């Protein structure tokens, strides 16, 4: 199953982006490989983010998503293959419990991609960050790696299934150690 997830993340993302006419301009790609496992933090703009992350991170990672996506016909099967952790955002206590397997996955060597805002931002401005991603990184003793994406929301609007051709600018920033936090 992990091999299938790795192939789907890398080749599937590459093919999907190419077929849609989306090109990535990546700065700092070496930072995606500098320290693994890691908690990759990205600004969430649209469903296109999933494909961009797959093309950048390529293998041995999973994600965290809202519970409502577990049975989504487009995202659900991908999430199942990738062992995505689904979080009930309406119940903080349950959400914390649901994050424990994510910490275990980090300790076992698998990276996590998560939007620290907890939702899509309707504009290019960042929303306030949730604490969960940082707690997971600290508990697992792994670094956080910020990934900044630009143009995803313009190329594929929120709640849309239409992808327009274009260029997504991606900056993978250096890993930030959580030791001593």
Predicted regions and their residues:
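Short glycine-rich anion-binding loops that position phosphate/pyrophosphate groups of nucleotides
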Residues: 44-47, 117-121
């Amino acid at each position: 199953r992990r091999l299938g997830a790795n192939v789907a993340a890398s080749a599937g993302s590459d093919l999907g982006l190419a077929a849609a006419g989306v090109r990535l301009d990546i700065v700092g790609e070496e930072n995606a490989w500098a320290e693994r496992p890691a908690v990759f933090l990205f600004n969430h703009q649209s469903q296109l983010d999933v494909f961009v992350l797959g093309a950048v991170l390529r293998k041995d990672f999973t994600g965290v998503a809202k519970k409502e996506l577990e049975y989504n016909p487009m995202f659900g099967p991908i999430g199942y293959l990738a062992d995505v952790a689904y979080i009930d955002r309406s119940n903080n206590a349950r959400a914390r419990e649901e994050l424990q397997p994510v910490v275990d996955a980090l300790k076992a060597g698998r990276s996590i991609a998560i939007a620290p805002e907890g939702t899509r931002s309707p504009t290019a401005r960042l929303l306030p960050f949730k604490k969960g991603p940082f707690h997971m990184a600290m508990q697992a003793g792994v670094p956080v790696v910020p990934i900044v994406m630009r143009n995803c929301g313009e190329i594929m609007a929120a709640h849309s299934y239409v992808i327009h051709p274009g260029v997504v600018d991606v900056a993978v920033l250096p890993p930030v150690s959580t030791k001593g936090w």
